[in-house]
Every structure is written in structure tokens, then in C-alpha cells.
From Swiss-Prot:
Positions of the catalytic residues: 52 (nucleophile), 55 (nucleophile), 171 (nucleophile), 174 (nucleophile)
Catalytic activity line of the entry: Catalyzes the rearrangement of -S-S- bonds in proteins
Protein name in the entry: Protein disulfide-isomerase like 2-1
Cysteines joined through disulfide linkages: 52-55, 171-174
Gene: PDIL2-1
Species assigned in the record: Arabidopsis thaliana (Mouse-ear cress)
Site (Lowers pKa of C-terminal Cys of second active site): 236
Length: 361
């Protein structure tokens, strides 16, 4: 197979993966609004602004609603960013945020939702208007809850990098951060060496004082090699947190929790793979020995990657030069299906490393 076809396959797979992990709340734009709304299903639409405090407070409730109704074929749960999509917001008379409107099936004439802004009330409203009987889904919590009983065991574990939010239940900024912080925990839930945690420092004042907490929320990072901890002073968007953890922990996740194309790549072994592919049949065993030697020097999480490089190099020698491209194709097909996150990680690492074999052929 030509290299261009292989790289096209990678790009297509990436698009499939992004679609598979898209938010349960459908994002609408000026261009897509009337292609989705007013058709064969009723639609509940939140018109919001990213800077709006009430919108931030509503966000986790609305996401819970979206998760619950995602399989309901007769109902759409959607949202519009009115900072970006001014035309459609103006058209439907939006003058404050958040504005929630219900569009009946086959109609672009909305009725404004005036009820409580929580998932339970919204679900009751949608079920009534949409003729559905959907129960609210339980939303998994991936943020580790700390207490005085487990704080030292979790935070001071020298095998883990731990990000801790010290918060107070009454703190408005903490409430605004909560949905983003939960997403951060979800992104890194497959990483054994990373923990995203929080502590109610209002209820557990002694721990807050011990770590110099004087305002809420306070975020502190406790890396494996510095359990005194230090303040996190970065941005508070999802991408900011993900970039920080990737840099500090050596992980390679995107904001959807998928491994990036850099995951598993070891530069020194990549260089040896290129030599292996270019080597004559008589020279390949000598290069394989060097790969084995280099892999044995790796430490920490890279030890796993070294073993995978060695295994794939042996398969490349045993099965022939077309092994890498055929195996890459097969992995692409499997990754395009519904598989567990653990399996997806395993196959993505393998595919990433095989990319060097393919590119060097």
C-alpha cells in the first residue's frame, strides 16, 4: 500500500475517534442549526456565553441531561455559543444567558423554558414535551475525593503525580471549575501514575492550613519527586490542565482522553527502527540486538514501550517488510469499532510505534 493511503487511513481514523468521543450535548452553529432543529425530533437548546457565571453553573446539569438523552431517537439536547454564533442567537431573540428554548418536532417556533435549571427538572420537561420516558443517567465521578484519612496515602504516594483542588462548597469559582475539573480527571483516568483529586478544605481546615491554602479554589501539584507540592498557576480551561499534566507527567493525552500520536514513541528506539528497516537481511539481527540493549536501559513508563518496540521489531523480521503496513491497517479497523478504553490505549501505542516502520519503508 502506498504511504499516502496509509496516512489517509490515519487521518480518517482520527476523525472517527473524535466523533466517537464527542460530547453528549450537540454543539450547533449558525450553519448547522436549522439542519438539526425543526426536523424529525424535538430539540432543547441552551443559548449560552462562555463567560457567563450562570451558564457555567448550569453546565454539569446540562451535560448530565445530554448523557441521559443521547440514545433517545426523538429528542435532541443541544447548545449554541452565542459569542461565536451571533446570527442564530439574534434570530431566536436571545437577550440573556443562559436562555433555554424547546423546539417541537417539525417546528422552528420555540417556547422558552422557565423552570428550574437542574437536570431533574429539565428531564421532566423534555419527557413531557418530547413524549419520552427517559431516566437520568448516573454520571461517573473520576475525581478522587480526599479526606484526612486517605490524604497522605494518595497524595504522598511517590509512584504518582497528584493534582489537588482545595475547595469550599459555597465557593462560586469552585462551582464554575467543577465540570472542567471532572473532565480533567476523565481524560487521565487510564493513567496509573496520575491522580486528579480534591479536598473540601472548608470541612477539613487543618489540612488546608497545613498546605498554605488561603483562598478557594487553590490548586497544588504533588509530583512523584516533590511531595511538598507547589501551586498550580496555569489556566483553568481543559486544554490548559491537559497540557500541564502531559508536560509534568510525561503522558500524551488529548482533551478527549485519547492517546496522541506521540504516545509510546521513544526517539532513540525510533532511530534504531529506521536502521532496521534500511538494513540488509544479514544486518537486521545485529540491529535487533541493539534495540534489545537500548530497551533494557529504559526506566519508568518507557520500559513498557521498549518491550513493545522489541516485540514489533521481531515480528517485522519474522513476517516480512509488509508486516507493518498490514498490521497498521488491521489496527485501524479494530480501533474504529467500539472497544474498551484500555484496549484502545494498547492498540494505539502499537499503531504509533508501527508508524515509524511504515514511514521508513
Amino acid at each position: 500500500m502506498a504511504k499516502s493511503q496509509i496516512w489517509f487511513g490515519f487521518a480518517l481514523l482520527a476523525l472517527l475517534l473524535v466523533s466517537a468521543v464527542a460530547d453528549d450535548v450537540v454543539v450547533l452553529t449558525d450553519d448547522s442549526f436549522e439542519k438539526e432543529v425543526g426536523k424529525d425530533k424535538g430539540a432543547l437548546v441552551e443559548f449560552y456565553a462562555p463567560w457567563c457565571g450562570h451558564c457555567k453553573k448550569l453546565a454539569p446539569e446540562y451535560e448530565k441531561l445530554g448523557a441521559s438523552f443521547k440514545k433517545a431517537k426523538s429528542v435532541l439536547i443541544a447548545k449554541v455559543d452565542c459569542d461565536e454564533q451571533k446570527s442564530v442567537c439574534t434570530k431566536y431573540g436571545v437577550s440573556g444567558y443562559p436562555t433555554i428554548q424547546w423546539f417541537p418536532k417539525g417546528s422552528l417556533e420555540p417556547q422558552k423554558y422557565e423552570g428550574p435549571r437542574n437536570a431533574e427538572a429539565l428531564a421532566e420537561y423534555v419527557n413531557k414535551e418530547g413524549g419520552t420516558n427517559v431516566k437520568l443517567a448516573a454520571v461517573p465521578q473520576n475525581v478522587v475525593v480526599l479526606t484526612p484519612d486517605n490524604f497522605d496515602e494518595i497524595v504522598l504516594d511517590q509512584n504518582k503525580d497528584v493534582l489537588v483542588e482545595f475547595y469550599a462548597p459555597w465557593c462560586g469559582h469552585c462551582k464554575s471549575l467543577a465540570p472542567t475539573y471532572e473532565k480533567v480527571a476523565t481524560v487521565f483516568k487510564q493513567e496509573e501514575g496520575v491522580v486528579i483529586a480534591n479536598l473540601d478544605a472548608d470541612a477539613h481546615k487543618a489540612l488546608g492550613e497545613k498546605y498554605g491554602v488561603s483562598g478557594f479554589p487553590t490548586l497544588k501539584f504533588f509530583p512523584k519527586d516533590n511531595k511538598a507540592g507547589h501551586d498550580y498557576d496555569g489556566g483553568r480551561d481543559l486544554d490548559d490542565f491537559v497540557s500541564f499534566i502531559n508536560e509534568k507527567s510525561g503522558t500524551s493525552r488529548d482533551s478527549k482522553g485519547q492517546l496522541t500520536s506521540k504516545a509510546g514513541i521513544v526517539e532513540s528506539l525510533d532511530a534504531l527502527v529506521k536502521e532496521l528497516v534500511a538494513a540488509s537481511e544479514d544486518e537486521k539481527k545485529a540491529v535487533l540486538s541493539r534495540i534489545e540493549e537500548e530497551a533494557s536501559t529504559l526506566k519508568g513508563s518507557t520500559t513498557r514501550y521498549g518491550k513493545l518496540y522489541l516485540k514489533l521489531a521481531k515480528s517485522y523480521i519474522e513476517k516480512g517488510s509488509d508486516y507493518a503496513s498490514k498490521e497498521t491497517e488491521r489496527l485501524g479497523r479494530v480501533l474504529g469499532k467500539s472497544i474498551s478504553p484500555v484496549k484502545a490505549d494498547e492498540l494505539t501505542l502499537k499503531r504509533n510505534i508501527l508508524t515509524t516502520f511504515v514511514a521508513s519503508s
